[in-house]
Amino acid sequence: MEGDRHTPPAAASVSKVLDDDDLLVEILLHVGFPTTLVGAALVCKRWLGHASEPAFLRRFRELHPPRLLGFYIDDRYCDSAPPTFVRMLPQPAELSAIVRRTNFSPYRRLSPGMLDCRNGSVFVTLHTDKSALGVHRPLCHGGGLTVLPSLPRPQLPLGSSCSFRQVLSKEGDGLSYYYLYVESSNRESRMHVYMMQDGSWRRHHLLDIGQLPRPRSTPKAVLVGNKIYMAAGPSGILVLDLTTSGFSTVQLPQGVEHGSRGTTMLSRAGDASGVYLIHVKVFQLCIWLRKGGNWLPVDSICLHDMCANLSKSDSTIKDWHTVLLMDQVVDYGGFVFLQMGGCVLHLDIRCRTLRKVYEYRSTRYRDIHPFMMIWPPIFPALKYDPASNLKKKDTRKLMDCTCVVKLRRE
């Protein structure tokens, strides 16, 4: 009987929220993470409608930009060991269960090797065939490991070899996969562009690069909208427009060259409006945004004092006079990973803070693969609408959200 006395106030609170669209939207805006938003949207179709509305998602992203959850690194003594996942600390308690799903222990027998991370999807090669490709989606319920068909192997003419290859992906009406393969000889270069269609790789384009500068294997290429940006030559970028099948070239800002490994990096703009260029020379890190046909200066940071202070406070960091950009593909999010000696450093560009996040176990310094919170959220379809008969756990979820909004306002 005592429980009945508490039912009317709770029911009245729930009813008040369900009858007020503006209040409900305000609560959903403050759930904190896209994965939590998906859970809240499962309550009923009405909640799902609000949570999946484009204008709402734009506001949600402004309040909660995609978060760096950690990174994968292929730091292993033998090819049979799975990639290592390193969490970025601290992490909110709500994300603990999700981050636990990032490891590859269940797939150890397949000896996965890292290729890339993109918006919550992890691309790996599989030991059964180094051309076989697997996709792991830790942030999706029941994501598991999806095995894609083996990567194509073009038949090369005598005297030609593969000088560049990379798997790329993009979101749209589903997830699209592209595979770039450049064959080169002393006289010419050709680019094979494959696209995953109906469960198989199909050639999308076969293009002569001609007299254009050849793509470089580092820094890695990025796909922005329908254009692929590839570092090429000593100081250029080769741009492939997938819509027109045409190439164009872009020169780096004056005085900037790709140089040796760890000098430049390309990064996608989060809204797919352009591409960022990040350049390190000695201790100077500079950032530009390519937009409207011009390079726009974004930021410039002197790393000397930060590196010196970090070396003094941590005796494990050696050779602090050499700072390199780690080859990484990620949407520009105000951070970058650097390599100094045998350590991985995380530079928060906005806060101007530098910290060590990993120390290599082997002397083979592999690439790093940042793992970001998924965006936009993937909402499942609801087969029925329980809005008129909410379960107790849904009521508790609503009350928790209401408390979060109240506390943040105070």
What residues fall within each predicted segment?
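N-terminal entry/capping and adjacent linker segments that precede and initiate structured domains
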Residues: 1-410
